[in-house]
A protein has these predicted regions:
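Hydrophobic core positions in small helical hairpin nucleic-acid-binding modules
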Residues: 3-122, 128
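Short beta-strand elements that form the blades of beta-propeller/WD-repeat-like
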Residues: 25-27, 75-78, 132-135, 231-233, ...
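Conserved structured catalytic cores and adjacent interaction surfaces
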Residues: 125-258, 267-279
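Conserved small/polar residues in nucleotide/adenosyl-binding loops
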Residues: 1-8, 280-287
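Nucleotide-binding motor/catalytic cores of P-loop/tubulin-like NTPases across gene-expression machines
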Residues: 43-57, 250-269, 282
Length: 291
């Protein structure tokens, strides 16, 4: 009888019961290679240094725009330019690889369609009722959606945004009282309260978040913010600008915003953005690059 109970207990165990809790870094290259390695592999360094060799690229021009720090029991959410989302437990990824390995093709992990690519990657520990997703498109449309609407996801993923010919470029997690910041390729930015975006269902479209001054301008970065921390903006020529969020006044959604980086031949167009939690330390966060 004792052996029967032991077999029943073993059958009731889930894989997550067997997996240790480890802090890892998840990277996804623009070329579509994803990998996880232990966070202890990296160390903090000073600005201007040579750095340490990271993910090996399979071709010239590939970059790593998406980075997340996660626990192995967290869930990864992959959002695509078509507005679909796929989920994966971190411990389901291949075992930790070396810092210089190229990783695994993301198409081997999630069911991407033809010409579909991942444009945002976030991690969650649970689908909290009071947490929202803030989604931003290439043309500046925004959408706010309750995170629990992503429950019961299967391998086919879920449609989260009615886009038409637009593309989803950024997804962030937000609480009820946080602000949204959007930055464009021409150096404009806008900050507005997230509660100016009415929560909608998965199949709904978006509303205007920022009004572009030219038809050539596109969104390159978005995140949720408050008065603490800094916004780092980087141009294509590697020039960066770090500004405290307290200097970005909150505006009404849908305006043209303010100039955050004067685009010149010396800076190049805005390529990326990131949040700095202090003047010296960047927060690990995905960035949307349109190079």
């Amino acid at each position: 009888l004792g052996d029967v109970y032991k077999r029943q207990d073993l059958r009731e165990w889930k894989r997550e019961d067997m997996e240790p809790h480890l802090e890892v870094v998840i990277t996804l290259s623009k070329g579509g290679y994803v990998k996880r390695i232990l966070s202890s592999t990296y160390r903090a360094q000073h600005r201007g240094g040579k750095g340490v060799k990271g993910q090996r690229m399979t071709k010239d021009g590939d970059i790593v725009p998406y980075i997340q720090v996660a626990d192995t029991h967290d869930t990864l959410l992959f959002f695509t330019d078509k507005g679909r989302v796929f989920s994966l437990r971190v411990f389901e990824m291949s075992a930790d690889q070396s810092r210089t390995s190229r990783g695994t093709p993301i198409a081997n992990i999630i069911n991407l369609g033809p010409n579909e690519k991942v444009t945002a990657m976030i991690t969650v520990s649970s689908l909290l009722e009071d947490t929202y997703l803030i989604m931003v498109t290439k043309t500046g449309k925004v959408k706010r959606m309750h995170l629990p609407l992503l429950r019961n996801m299967n391998k086919a993923g879920l449609n989260t945004f009615k886009l038409g010919k637009d593309e989803l470029v950024s997804v962030s997690l937000a609480d009820e009282n946080e602000d949204v910041v959007i930055v464009t390729r021409e150096g404009l930015s806008i900050r507005f309260p997230s509660d100016q975006i009415r929560p909608t269902q998965r199949g709904a479209g978006g509303i205007r978040g920022i009004r572009m001054k030219t038809s050539q301008d596109v969104v390159v970065y978005s995140d949720v913010v408050n008065d603490d921390g800094y916004l780092l903006i980087v141009g294509r020529r590697g020039k960066g600008k770090l500004s405290a969020f307290r200097h970005y006044r909150s505006q009404n959604r849908g305006g043209s915003g303010l100039l955050t980086l004067k685009v010149t031949s010396n800076t190049g167009k805005v390529a990326a953005g990131a949040i700095a939690v202090s003047y010296t330390h960047l927060r690990a966060h995905e960035t949307s690059l349109h190079l």
